[in-house]
Regions:
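Conserved phosphate/anionic-ligand binding catalytic regions in large, soluble enzymes, centered on
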Residues: 20-40, 123-126, 204-216, 355-361, ...
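Glycine-rich phosphate-binding loop plus the immediately following alpha-helix
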Residues: 136-164, 296-312, 316-326
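Phosphate-binding and adjacent anionic-ligand microenvironments
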Residues: 264-266, 270, 286, 306-476, ...
């Protein structure tokens, strides 16, 4: 690249400038970026500096024990070992998980072992060239302000890396006991005595989920899921799915094909670090991936139906469906909306169940205060097996919910803009001149989320409430020059024959809202 830049290659020169212009920013999500040389990329020097800053932050607060985990991405094990070396050199007690493992195991281990913090080296579902660095504190939850700012300041204060002690040993590599403790807890999520007969087709998408998913299903008493052979082994290059996000079109094609060949009842996919879980089921017109909001409603329903008198709080992000709040209210449960991200959902006092529309679910917050694709898969399998024994399906439960609470249809729209400055300008325009109509529905209220309120911290976003139970939430992406729009339309359902008509009406309205948003802003749309 240096040679190409010296020879006048403009793209090579721009890449070099970007790599060395500033530092990779540490925030509530920690670090995440492409692996390459330079302070604005993920590499050993950036990780060493981050670990040194975290060590200083923890030492100033009396924290000592830190659990470090890693996934199977390129260099994840090296970044984890470097972190342990820096923490040990700073006088802290570093405990390294025994092998590449899912993120939920790290979140579980923090409180199980009484640690002051945890670090997970993963880029979750990002492309293969990326890696990341997530930080949790002693509550087992990802950091929120002001901890992110304070840790970032400690990182900035780190001097020359040559002066940072890095012993070659001295930290503890944990045994399998912590993994077995997690599995025992996960396997207890399905209640004893509930049906277990179910055929599941599963893919870990080249990530670290397979071994623990299979072990958890076995310990819980389910038949072994059928696994997509071509995607079974951890492979940091993700050869069959260059963008290994289960939400992306086409990513579930292989596992759905396996389900069709084998007559499976349920499709499950975990993302590469297994903290998220996608599901698909067969409908009369073919297999379809369930939206995150649909799975969230199903999991909440299963918790309620199997535990009469259930107590606690249900929570989901403000960009997720309003259906969860209606389900909670109907069963005497409190409901709390939060900002996006499990760092907020997991902090809700008294949480019993939380989810976000981006296929993240927390079904056992007493053990894992983060999204956990493995326990979510187990709870969904319990519901599917119970329904199978009754001669019913997950689709039937979704229909029941539509009849009781109205048909809730959610969708998303990404509005791409040239740069972050343009995104900010569009948000200003939407604040100053909000639309009066969207999809044929009157906008009767605009909430400026930068002002906070309703128990929510301030965040950059807008919420439009529509006449007839609908809403649009718009917020800028934190990583890309685009605006994310989250849409929901609610259609009443009367008799059974109204369901199909309600679905059609909702779809027409959502598509009209999308067109209105894109047209009003005069910019192209993307998924």
């Amino acid at each position: 690249m240096l040679v190409a830049a010296e020879q006048g290659d403009g793209s090579a020169r721009a890449e070099l400038v970007d790599r060395f212009d500033g530092r990779l920013e540490f925030g509530t999500a920690g670090l995440r970026g492409a692996m390459a040389a330079g302070p604005n990329r993920m590499n050993r020097l950036v990780v060493l500096r981050a670990a040194a800053g975290l060590a200083a932050y923890l030492a100033a607060r009396g924290g000592r024990r830190v659990v470090v985990g890693y996934d199977a991405r390129h260099r994840s094990d090296t970044f984890a070992a470097d972190t342990c070396a820096v923490l040990t050199g700073a006088g802290l007690q570093a405990m390294l998980l025994p092998r590449a493992l899912p993120t939920p195991v790290l979140a579980f281990a923090i409180r199980h072992l009484g640690a002051a913090a945890g670090v997970m080296v993963t880029a979750s579902h990002n492309p293969s060239q990326d890696n990341g660095y997530k930080v949790y504190l002693d509550d087992g939850v990802q950091i929120v302000p002001p901890a992110d700012v304070e840790i970032a300041a400690a990182i900035d204060a780190v001097g020359p890396l040559a002066s940072v002690p890095r012993p070659v040993s001295g930290w503890e590599t944990l045994g399998e006991e912590v993994v077995q403790a997690y599995l025992a807890r996960a396997a207890s999520v399905p209640l004893p005595g509930t049906p277990r007969e179910l055929r599941v087709a599963y893919t870990p998408l080249h990530g670290v989920g397979r071994d623990l998913v299979l072990a958890a299903f076995r310990q819980a008493g389910f038949p072994a899921p059928l696994v997509v052979d071509a995607q079974a082994e951890p492979d940091p290059d993700f050869p069959t799915v260059p963008f290994p996000n289960p939400e992306e079109p086409g990513v579930l094609d292989r596992v759905v094909a396996l389900a069709q060949r084998t007559g499976a009842d349920l499709v499950i996919a975990t993302d590469p670090d297994a903290d998220r879980c996608a599901a698909a089921v067969a409908f009369p017109d073919g297999w379809r991936m369930l939206r995150g909001d649909e799975v969230g409603a199903l999991l909440a329903t299963q918790l309620i139906r199997r535990e009469p008198g259930l107590t606690g709080v249900f929570a989901c992000s403000i960009v997720s469906s309003s259906l969860l709040g209606r389900i909670a209210a109907a069963h005497g449960l409190d409901y709390v909306p939060t900002l996006t991200g499990f760092k907020w959902i997991a902090r809700v006092p008294g949480l019993r169940f939380g989810y976000e529309e981006a296929i993240g679910y927390c079904v056992d917050p007493a053990a894992v205060r983060d999204k956990d694709g493995i326990t979510a898969a187990l709870l969904l399998a319990e519901l599917a097996a119970t329904l199978r024994a009754e001669g019913r399906s997950l689709g039937d439960v979704l229909d029941d919910l539509a009849r009781e609470f109205g048909l809730h249809l959610t969708d998303q729209l990404a509005i791409r803009v040239p740069d972050h400055a343009r995104a900010a300008a569009v948000m200003r325009h939407l604040r100053d001149a909000p639309p009066r109509m969207l999809g044929g529905r009157v906008v009767h209220r605009m909430d400026d989320l930068t002002a906070g309120g309703e128990g929510l911290p301030a965040t950059d976003g807008l919420r439009y409430l529509l006449v007839g139970q609908g809403r649009v939430v718009i917020r800028p992406s934190g990583t890309e020059p685009k605006l994310k729009c989250y849409l929901e339309v609610v259609e009443p359902v009367g008799a059974d024959s109204d369901l199909a008509r309600a679905r059609k009406r909702a779809r027409v309205t959502v598509d009209a809202i999308k067109a209105d948003l894109a047209g009003a802003l005069g910019v192209p749309t993307g998924s």
